[in-house]
Amino acid sequence: MAATELRGVVGPGPAAIAAPGGGGAGPPAVGGGGGRGDAGPGPGVAAATAATAGGPGPGAGGVAAGGPGSAPPAAGSGGSGAGGSGSAREGWLFKWTNYIKGYQRRWFVLSNGLLSYYRSKAEMRHTCRGTINLATANITVEDSCNFIISNGGAQTYHLKASSEVERQRWVTALELAKAKAVKMLAESDDSGDEESVSQTDKTELQSTLRTLSSKVEDLSTCNDLIAKHGTALQRSLSELESLKLPAESNEKIKQVNERATLFRITSNAMINACRDFLMLAQTHSKKWQKSLQYERDQRIRLEETLEQLAKQHNHLERAFRGATVLPANPPGSAGSGKDQCCSGKGDMSDEDDENEFFDAPEIITMPENLGHKRTGSNISGASSDVSLDEQYKHQLEETKKEKRTRIPYKPNYSLNLWSIMKNCIGKELSKIPMPVNFNEPLSMLQRLTEDLEYHELLDRAAKCENSLEQLCYVAAFTVSSYSTTVFRTSKPFNPLLGETFELDRLEENGYRSICEQVSHHPPAAAHHAESKNGWTLRQEIKITSKFRGKYLSIMPLGTIHCIFHSTGHHYTWKKVTTTVHNIIVGKLWIDQSGEIDIVNHKTGDKCNLKFVPYSYFSRDVARKVTGEVTDPSGKVHFALLGTWDEKMDCFKVQAASGENGGDARQRGHEAEDSRVMLWKRNPLPKNAENMYYFSELALTLNAWEGGTAPTDSRLRPDQRLMENGRWDEANAEKQRLEEKQRLSRKKREAEAAKATEDGTPHDPYKALWFERKKDPVTRELTHIYSGEYWECKEKQDWGSCPDIF
């Protein structure tokens, strides 16, 4: 299946198909593809073809595949020096596109921390083929001419310069631009939930206006002083000339007078120029101030109009719901009525006339510092060396036997949503401070662990002898991870840097899991789960989100790996885009859209899953997912059909004679009797609508457990306060934690700056339980579990854990 590259997005190719024949080195595992207009198979797709033809892939040699006679493109025009348009550097480089075209010459422009490329210099005026942000990118030198730029997610550029000198010039310029971009990013980023970007822009604009005004005043003062001192000098010289002095002195005075006259003429010209500039600056300053005030007034009017439209839209929706019958599967519901919970209050308006109050169950209290044996500083700052007594051990045993089945009900807090969300349009939400009113009492690490809710699908897959059948269960597991999102419209807490979460279900379910927040900017979490039933799941996910006014887009970046121990089958896939609709008015509802390609890197088997976006005008079932399981030759063996919130079925495909294409359902209708239900969603617990629509697993995730690391999400105080319904205290505690994280970051930056000044080495922040290295399969830089957490837990040795709470 050809992995074509869209604008600025690079599609990784499998690149793990064994190369029979006498081919040279295989291609890099991460596909380099061209940008928009360079569509074609990524470097990993045609591995077998390249090997048969005998041509090495774009490795160190940089030769395009296509047979022994292929040659690299002519390396005549490498990167030029600094170009125009304010760019730090621009020039020609060779970029790997695909196995058919190999390396192609592209015009690259490095400016403002962004590396963009075009097919030609003339194309800069209208079409950019791709852009990568260096602030989050990694630059790797392969050999004398080749280097790689990757952001660890969907973008990877394999580049080649015309010479080693040219390559070094580009790499140096890129490293400098990256350092500057990272510094600017750090200056504007004070915490995971930092001050509003719009407020920062406003402050910067006001500061600029004040500076300009001050400079204009200085210019006016200098103008007056030059005129004053010039006149005084001329007068003094005239008086000196009129005095009776010897002839020789008179000659000297005449020379000085001539020079003073030249100075007067020159200074008068400068004074006139300054006066003209001053008048022009004052005129334009007034125009700018008027324009700025006009834009402010327009913004206020636009906000008022948008708010009015939102209210009208809300009234229309309510009137429509009251006058008509909703379809069988509206976007705010999931599945059939028999297993659907009663809907919660989804209308995000300020009206509270329909508030409902419930009797909340008892508050969950958390023992302090039990089970933590630290060699260094303790969480509270005082040394604590508490061992588990017999009574506490008994309590833990009881906790293991009985998992909690409920949490305190969600309180009804009034909130002026519009006052917060109107400033978020087009922004990255991880940079905007949000009250806990928008949250659910779980962290992103715990949400990531929820992917294991249907772990039994991987247990079944591990027992499959047929790799294609195994792929069906892996696909069902992939879809099942979205079933918990159908009602979950609240956001999880952003983890603090170094925060962890463990889930030890080795005795009950045969698996255990550990997550860690490994990066603060961009926010990234690493996850590793292992099962005694024969599988390992690992991933590093970066979450980016944009608020578009009516909806919120959440785009997870990163690759998920699943390895089966007995067969060595190694599967990878990426997540789709999640969209939250009706942010301002109406009932919040969530949709998943996009495609997932699951690849078995050992056999070459693939599964393509399509998440169909919801449409009011479509007659198709809501939340539909379709899929095909194919062998390396592209032949379809199984078709998948279902919904991401309810269930997934598969059936064998009996292709028509000589026909391999067409729709999977049309080809497989003959084998309807072979349909097998792979997965079905578990019903939600009773009263789930009052408990954030948590599943049975989610209800247990924040239950306090002894012996965990002091950085565990269960010990996060603002999250615990929110779960117990004390939201005002939770907001105050959240601000304290963010300020503490901010101070820690500034301390690390100061230490790094001092080390740079002293010329001493300084190690950047490193994750505690994960190591950043190149993935052997995808060749991406990612965090892989180092294998020490459970040993430290057994010893209760948490001395290396940072104090983050």
Curated annotation (Swiss-Prot):
Annotated coiled-coil segments of the chain: 289-324, 728-759
Compositional bias annotation for Basic and acidic residues: 713-764
Biased composition (Polar residues): 376-386
InterPro entries linked to this entry: OSBP_sf, Oxysterol-bd, Oxysterol-bd_CS, PH-like_dom_sf, PH_domain
Protein keywords: Acetylation, Coiled coil, Cytoplasm, Endoplasmic reticulum, Golgi apparatus, Lipid transport, Lipid-binding, Membrane, Phosphoprotein, Transport
Residues annotated for ergosterol binding in this entry: Q312
Family annotation (CDD domains): PH_OSBP_ORP4 (cd13284)
GO CC annotation terms, alphabetical: cell junction; cytosol; endoplasmic reticulum membrane; Golgi membrane; nucleolus; nucleoplasm; perinuclear region of cytoplasm; trans-Golgi network
Chief location bin: cytoplasm
Residues bound to a 1,2-diacyl-sn-glycero-3-phospho-(1D-myo-inositol 4-phosphate): L115, S116, Y117, Y118, R119, S120, K491, P492, F493, N494, H520, H521
Domain PH as annotated: residue spans: 86-179
Gene Ontology biological process terms in this record: ceramide transport; intracellular cholesterol transport; phospholipid transport; positive regulation of insulin secretion involved in cellular response to glucose stimulus; positive regulation of secretory granule organization; sphingomyelin biosynthetic process; sterol transport
Protein's name according to its UniProt entry: Oxysterol-binding protein 1
Organism name: Mus musculus
